[in-house]
């Protein structure tokens, strides 16, 4: 730079500092220490806006411009001091430094990686983590020399590029013609303090979370001088502004010169306080506040949407995701009056068999946490985890380990049991006291390790539930007690679970797609950074619950003495605060306390009230509010807090009523099908992600029984948002809201539904509404949309006309449309041609060899004959009769009626009757089937014989069963329900046979259902149905075929069967046997296996089976939607 450029830069910077940093300079002038170094931090963006020419000079000549800035800053301070009228208490300071920050964000100036050779001489901003700090040294940067010949005195500055060594000139620099080369140093004996400065070297490393997998983080040295010394410590995240420079040792003969790239720092910014690296503006906060306002009536549904976005590549595992989210949210750190610090970070240990997804959670947690370290136990030593003493250039330095680097962040340790015994003991202090005390190589210090530890380990051999966790994983009790939660993931080798997981993985591999309902990783990172700034306070109610639980744990006979210490109460407080943060609350409520207790109970550290649970098979609840209500009843009753329970139940009922009214108002305003509640994420279009499957298509073992539910309109509406809570059997004890496979009494009520959908729910609902159908479509049928586009199916009105529930008129014209399509049924089939022949021969052999079914033996299990507790407490009248009477006696107000209720008031003129499913799931009209029933051609002789069959007393709780055709049409597993005593299936079977028309869509992967057209073809050749209206089936054949048993995985095993009429069972089993002939044996489940005597595939195991439906099935069709009230028809006849 020439003199004119130096003058310009000095004048511009002096005027800028005098205008914008006058207050900073006044504060510096008031300081008493005149020899200290004082910084003035200048924002580069605002400075460059003042004069763009300075920016050009600064980029090209950073070292010269910084020197000019310091000189201009001193002149500006002097001018300000002289302009003040009173200078008392003010003194001029000579050691002023301009510190540049806030560079424009561009690749030329801002770097996240270590600079390279091409960056030498440029002013950059580099981000990294401090891994080593050296001792502070005294650096002499100037010396005076005198020429021995002419006595000329001159000053020599230390050369930074040669490690601050002094290089004497080759000749005397005096103006006189003195060519002497001998000089004497004038400062050999003592150096003036004015000629020395503080000097420190630190080593920074690239942040691991910003690197790709497999990249080894590089490191470089940073030179700190003057006021920058001791501005950081090991483990800090820094943003360093400085000039990239080279340096080398003085040249020596026959020695290779090694050049090193270092960063001479101008300003150091510590990012520990805002480690997220992102700015939390008002728009971001407002977005999350609107999200929780949207879920105000059902906050647990909003929480589950966040949990479903956590590690979405792992299917289910609801409990693990909840625990990981609570650990990432963290509690609040406290310091009492005595100065003792109580940690706020929770620690989680995942114990599980190989292949249960433990490492996936660790990797995802490390990604969404801004400050994280991921390591493994086998590759870590105690020094690598804590701190290492390293000797560098003749001196010992401390190098930070994984726990120190993860200070105020997350440390993930995989294969935790691989740590050596003496290495495990080294992290005791780091986990509890949150510090590490070091006394190595003469260095005694204490480093902070305020980190959350998320560890994963495998059990030692086969996990033995009878032994303690400490024995199973070979970890000592002192270390194990420092973990707040210990979750056990046991691979129970469940065949159905394996089928579901394999289908989920293959589906994502073959058809990868993203869900709009899932939160992105950036949004998750922003949310967890935001909620860590919340400080919820404990309420009196939550204190009461946590204290009572801690007392019961201490009094438990089976308590772990090493675990039930005061650490347990502190863990409960941390978990409750973490859940309040996760729910975006400013206070810890009863919901947070109950959730913390339930998670602690499911952990192997708890279990005093209800026992532990296998966290692997826990799935997302269908109704989060009902799940929480179940938790409240179990936990608060065990804790003997009846007052809190009643108050909470009243509050939940009030919230439920509000949400029901909100659902109905949305339905009326937008004129969509009933049951589409806006504040339920399950009603959004299903895409191929784990979110929708886990939130809305999971095993609903988490629901409550009907007897436990308060009498609110939301739990009893058949069109509620997929709410089937009223049909659950209540179990006395146990964590049945978390583990659907922990007991044979629990069986799946819903199915895992593939989110592979192309028709949105709104469109499907509009189609159904236009056709005046009362059934509710839960998912858009993909196969039906494809056939409609290809022109193979009639209109939706013709298809849905025979399936009206609650009695919608069906005209002769609609029947004609269905019948006219019967001739094209065979052309639509897309099944391999060899299957009909094989199935036909198999069915003929079975029909010849079977014998008449025997009546129920007296040793039938009670579960098959006695109504379940949930159903036994309902009304004594059959559900069909109750519904008919309810429609007449209890009309709803006109303003609150949904389209379903309005359609239900039509009078039913046909001789058939369709009812809603008693299972709590709304009937779904089939999307690819036509069923036409001409009841006028029923033989009168058969009617008289069926009318003479005695009717079971109406006091028993009953369920209904209908035609299986509609389930087969979707190409999915059939759902078998129970027959009511007032139905007559043989007549229905013969009546529907000639008129049934079936279109089978192309079967997809994982589809295990039978093909209806094969059954139709077999029956046509056997003379049973499908083509000959006058043909009859011999009663003996029907009875013999009844020895087959078939059940759908979606039927609940926990609900018992009421007594049935023999002919009802015969006809139902006849259809089942035909269906079974066309179904793979692997899809059958032995619900009725105890009743049948032949062809029994398997017995109910102690572990309840999971759903065997494929993830590619789109919707679940209710059999009861196709059931006919034959008793009513017989009464109409004379």
Swiss-Prot record:
Q: Where in the cell is it found?
A: Nucleus; Chromosome
Give the top-level enzyme category. hydrolase
Write down which residues bear the modification named Phosphoserine.
Answer: 754, 795
**Composition bias, Low complexity:** 861-872, 1090-1099
The residues listed in the UniProt record as binding ATP, with positions renumbered to this chain, are 352-359
Tell me what induces its expression.
Answer: By E2F1 and serum stimulation.
Tissue-level expression: Ubiquitously expressed.
Catalytic activity, per the record? ATP + H2O = ADP + phosphate + H(+)
**Biased-composition ranges for Basic residues?**
876-885
Q: What is its EC number?
A: 3.6.4.12
UniProt region (Disordered), positions on chain: 659-1101
Summary of the knockout phenotype? Females are viable but are sterile due to defects in double-strand break repair during gametogenesis. Males are not sterile and produce spermatozoa, but in much reduced quantity. Female ovaries are completely devoid of oocytes, and testes show a severe early proliferation defect of germ cells, causing a retarded development of only a fraction of seminiferous tubules that produce then apparently normal spermatozoa.
Molecular-function GO term, any one: enzyme binding
What's an example GO BP annotation here?
A: double-strand break repair via homologous recombination
Q: Does the keyword Acyltransferase apply?
A: no
Q: How does it assemble?
A: Component of the MCM8-MCM9 complex, which forms a hexamer composed of MCM8 and MCM9. Interacts with the DNA mismatch repair (MMR) complex composed at least of MSH2, MSH3, MSH6, PMS1 and MLH1. Interacts with MLH1; the interaction recruits MLH1 to chromatin. Interacts with MSH2; the interaction recruits MCM9 to chromatin. Interacts with MSH6. Interacts with the MRN complex composed of MRE11, RAD50 and NBN/NBS1; the interaction recruits the MRN complex to DNA damage sites. Interacts with RAD51; the interaction recruits RAD51 to DNA damage sites.
Which family does this protein fall into? Belongs to the MCM family.
Q: What does this protein do?
A: Component of the MCM8-MCM9 complex, a complex involved in the repair of double-stranded DNA breaks (DBSs) and DNA interstrand cross-links (ICLs) by homologous recombination (HR). Required for DNA resection by the MRE11-RAD50-NBN/NBS1 (MRN) complex at double-stranded DNA breaks to generate ssDNA by recruiting the MRN complex to the repair site and by promoting the complex nuclease activity. Probably by regulating the localization of the MNR complex, indirectly regulates the recruitment of downstream effector RAD51 to DNA damage sites including DBSs and ICLs.
Protein name in the entry? DNA helicase MCM9
> What organism, scientifically named, is this protein from?
Mus musculus
């Amino acid at each position: 730079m020439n003199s004119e450029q130096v003058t310009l830069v000095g004048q511009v910077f002096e005027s800028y500092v005098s205008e914008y940093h006058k207050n900073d300079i006044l504060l510096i002038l008031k300081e008493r220490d005149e020899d200290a170094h004082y910084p003035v931090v200048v924002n580069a963006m605002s400075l460059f806006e003042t004069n763009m020419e300075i920016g050009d000079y600064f980029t090209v000549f950073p070292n010269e411009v910084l020197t000019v800035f310091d000189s201009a800053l001193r002149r500006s301070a002097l001018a300000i001091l002289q302009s003040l009228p009173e200078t008392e208490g003010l003194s001029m300071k000579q050691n002023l430094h301009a510190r540049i920050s806030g560079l424009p964000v561009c690749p030329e100036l801002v770097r996240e990686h270590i600079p390279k050779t091409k960056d030498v001489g440029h002013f950059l901003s580099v981000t990294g983590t401090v891994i080593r700090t050296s001792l502070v040294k005294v650096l002499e940067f100037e010396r005076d020399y005198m020429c021995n010949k002419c006595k000329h005195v001159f000053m020599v500055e230390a050369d930074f590029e040669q490690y601050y060594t002094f290089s004497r000139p080759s000749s005397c620099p005096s103006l006189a013609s003195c060519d002497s080369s001998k000089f004497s140093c004038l400062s050999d004996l003592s150096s003036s303090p004015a000629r020395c400065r503080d000097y420190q070297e630190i080593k920074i490393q690239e942040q691991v979370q910003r690197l790709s997998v497999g990249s080894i983080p590089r490191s470089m040295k940073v030179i700190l001088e003057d006021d920058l010394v001791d501005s950081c410590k090991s483990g800090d995240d820094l943003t360093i502004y400085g000039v990239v420079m080279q340096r080398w040792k003085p040249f020596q003969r026959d020695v290779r010169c090694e050049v090193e790239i270092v960063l001479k720092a101008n300003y150091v910014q510590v990012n520990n306080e805002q480690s997220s690296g992102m700015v939390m503006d008002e728009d971001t906060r407002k977005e999350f506040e609107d999200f929780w306002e949207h879920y105000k009536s059902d906050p647990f549904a909003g929480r589950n949407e966040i949990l479903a976005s956590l590690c979405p590549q792992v299917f289910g595992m609801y409990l693990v995701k909840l625990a990981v989210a609570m650990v990432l949210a963290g509690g609040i750190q406290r310091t009492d009056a005595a100065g003792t610090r109580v940690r706020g970070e929770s620690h989680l240990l995942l114990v599980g068999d190989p292949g249960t997804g433990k490492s996936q959670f660790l990797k995802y947690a490390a990604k969404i946490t801004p400050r994280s370290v991921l390591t493994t136990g086998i590759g870590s030593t105690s020094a690598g985890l804590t701190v290492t003493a390293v000797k560098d250039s003749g001196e010992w330095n401390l190098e930070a380990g994984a726990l120190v680097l993860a200070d105020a962040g997350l440390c993930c340790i995989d294969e935790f049991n691989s740590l050596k015994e003496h290495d495990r003991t080294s992290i005791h202090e780091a986990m509890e006291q949150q510090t590490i005390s070091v006394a190595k190589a003469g260095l005694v210090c204490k480093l902070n390790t305020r980190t959350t530890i998320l560890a994963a380990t495998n059990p030692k051999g086969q996990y033995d539930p009878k032994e303690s966790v400490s024995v199973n994983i070979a970890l000592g009790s002192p270390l194990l007690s420092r973990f707040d939660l210990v979750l056990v993931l046991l691979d129970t080798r469940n065949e159905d679970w394996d089928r579901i997981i394999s289908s989920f993985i293959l589906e994502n591999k073959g058809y990868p797609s993203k869900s709009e309902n899932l939160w992105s990783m950036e949004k998750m990172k922003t949310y967890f950074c935001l909620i860590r700034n919340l400080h919820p306070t404990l309420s009196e109610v939550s204190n009461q619950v946590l204290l009572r639980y801690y007392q019961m744990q201490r009094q438990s006979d089976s308590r772990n003495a090493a675990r039930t210490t005061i650490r347990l109460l502190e863990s409960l407080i941390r978990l409750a605060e973490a859940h309040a943060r996760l729910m975006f609350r400013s206070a810890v409520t009863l919901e947070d306390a109950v959730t913390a207790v339930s998670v602690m109970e499911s952990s192997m550290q708890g279990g005093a009230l209800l026992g532990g649970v296998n966290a692997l098979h826990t799935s997302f609840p269908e109704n989060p509010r009902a799940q929480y209500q179940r938790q409240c009843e179990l936990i608060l009753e065990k804790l003997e807090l009846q007052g809190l329970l009643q108050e909470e139940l009243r509050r939940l009922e009030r919230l439920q009523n509000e949400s029901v009214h909100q659902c109905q108002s949305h339905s009326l305003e937008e004129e969509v099908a009933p049951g589409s509640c806006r504040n339920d994420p399950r009603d959004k279009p299903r895409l191929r992600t784990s979110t929708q499957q886990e939130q809305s298509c999971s095993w609903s073992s988490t629901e409550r029984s009907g007897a436990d539910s308060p009498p609110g309109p939301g739990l009893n509406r058949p069109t509620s948002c997929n709410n089937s809570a009223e049909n659950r059997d209540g179990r006395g004890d146990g964590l049945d809201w978390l583990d659907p496979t922990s007991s044979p009494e629990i069986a799946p009520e819903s199915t895992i539904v593939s989110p592979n959908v192309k028709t949105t729910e709104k469109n499907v609902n509009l189609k159904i509404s236009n056709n005046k159908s009362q059934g509710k479509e839960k998912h858009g049928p993909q196969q039906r949309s494809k056939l409609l586009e290809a022109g193979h199916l009639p209109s939706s009105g013709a298809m849905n006309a025979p399936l009206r529930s609650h009695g919608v008129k069906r005209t002769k014209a609609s029947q004609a449309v269905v019948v006219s399509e019967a001739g094209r049924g065979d052309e639509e089939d897309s099944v391999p041609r060899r299957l009909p022949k094989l199935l036909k021969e198999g069915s003929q052999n079975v029909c010849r060899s079977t014998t008449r079914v025997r009546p129920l033996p007296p040793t039938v299990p009670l579960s098959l004959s006695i109504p379940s507790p949930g159903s036994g407490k309902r009304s004594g009248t059959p559900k069909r009769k109750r519904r008919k009477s309810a429609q007449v006696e209890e009309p709803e107000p006109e303003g609150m009626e949904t389209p379903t209720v309005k359609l239900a008031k039509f009078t039913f003129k046909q001789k058939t009757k369709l009812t809603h499913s008693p299972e709590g799931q709304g009937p779904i009209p089939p999307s690819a089937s036509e069923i036409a029933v001409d009841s006028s051609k029923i033989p009168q002789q058969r009617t008289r014989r069926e009318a003479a069959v005695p009717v079971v007393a109406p006091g028993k709780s009953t369920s209904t069963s209908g035609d299986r055709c509609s389930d087969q049409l979707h190409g999915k597993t059939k759902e078998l329900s129970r027959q009511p005593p007032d139905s007559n299936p043989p007549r229905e079977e013969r009546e529907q046979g000639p008129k049934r028309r079936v279109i089978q869509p192309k079967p997809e992967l994982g589809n295990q259902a039978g093909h209806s057209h094969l059954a139709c073809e077999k029956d046509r050749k056997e003379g049973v149905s499908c083509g000959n209206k006058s043909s009859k089936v011999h009663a003996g054949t029907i009875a013999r075929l009844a020895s087959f048993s078939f059940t759908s995985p979606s039927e609940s095993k926990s609900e018992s069967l009421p007594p049935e009429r023999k002919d009802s069972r015969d006809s139902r089993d006849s259809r089942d046997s035909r269906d079974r002939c066309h179904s793979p044996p692997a899809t059958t489940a032995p619900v009725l296996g105890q009743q049948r005597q032949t062809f029994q595939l398997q017995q109910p195991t102690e572990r309840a089976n999971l759903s065997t439906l494929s993830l590619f099935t789109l919707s679940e069709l209710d059999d009861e939607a196709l059931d006919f009230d034959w008793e009513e028809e017989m009464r109409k006849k004379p």
